[in-house]
Amino acid sequence: MIRRYGLMTFCAAASVASVLAPAAKAQLWTWTTDQMVDYTKAWTGDRFPDGRPMVPDQWLERAKDMSQEEISVPGAGGRGGGGYTQYEGDWRVLHPEMKMTGRAFTMAFMPARADLDQVVMAKAKEKGIPSLNNQYGIDMLRPGDVLVVDLYGKKEGGTIVGDNLFYYVMKATHGGGLVVDGSLRDLDGISPMPMPCYFRSVHPSAIGGATLAAVNVPIRIGNVTVMPGDLVVGDREGVSFIPPQNAEAILDRADETHIHDEWTRLKFDEGKYKSSEIYGSPRDPALRQEYQEYLKKRLEEIRASRKK
């Protein structure tokens, strides 16, 4: 099933690119700047030169204070659907104590096939690209990026980086992070490095038997779709991918959820109330009014602190 997911991701990227990116002559599916802008046109903020949405650094900092529950927004089709928060769990987490926030830079691989690879590599060389491998995308990373890779759950040969390239990713992204639906190698060497990382497995093999199919197009990670430029938030629980056009509203909502939890625990500390009298919403009108006043005060304090 995992391998089929990877093929579905590739097929989706390929079908999009066959219509949208005829200029991608190296058989690497990607978007032109105009296509990137068109397919992310709901975002009206700043962009990178390639058109990828660039959410503000301040939002990355805000997200570090949020839990998965606080940023999770129900949508059409169930929790995480409807174009809101896209959550994926069941990871091995390198540093559970670290929060990960950044902007998604996407890569997708597919299982290698010799006859296709010969054509792909030949066309890449015609464009001056020596090799379409993991380093092709890694070398494009910017500060604040999180590298998000669909390696279709591949274990042996699905090792997107070892310790040397992990170190490079950490330096290039300024510690942004790595999410790979695949594996790592050199875990002993990687473990001391202070960058968040989410992966499925480990294996001592070098990356192999996989062909780079797409860079900075929509990809599938588990059961969610990730777009280039998504706000990525990871903690010990899992990873959420937030469409940039929804990110500020979700962070504002998360502030209110955080304050509600804060107030709830303060009332529990008083020892006067049953849980059902306070959580999830206070029953007593006087308590509801007290909460609204507390919420207003704390929001003003939080907003004032962010202006400093």
Feature locations, PLM:
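Bacterial N-terminal signal peptides that target proteins for export
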Residues: 1-11
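C-terminal segment of classical bacterial N-terminal signal peptides
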Residues: 15-23
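N-terminal pre-domain segments of enzymes
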Residues: 27-71, 76-79
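Buried hydrophobic positions in well-ordered alpha/beta secondary-structure cores of metabolic enzymes
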Residues: 51, 169, 230-232
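Feature captures the catalytic cores and cofactor-binding loops of soluble hydro-lyases/lyases
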Residues: 66-68, 80-228, 241-308
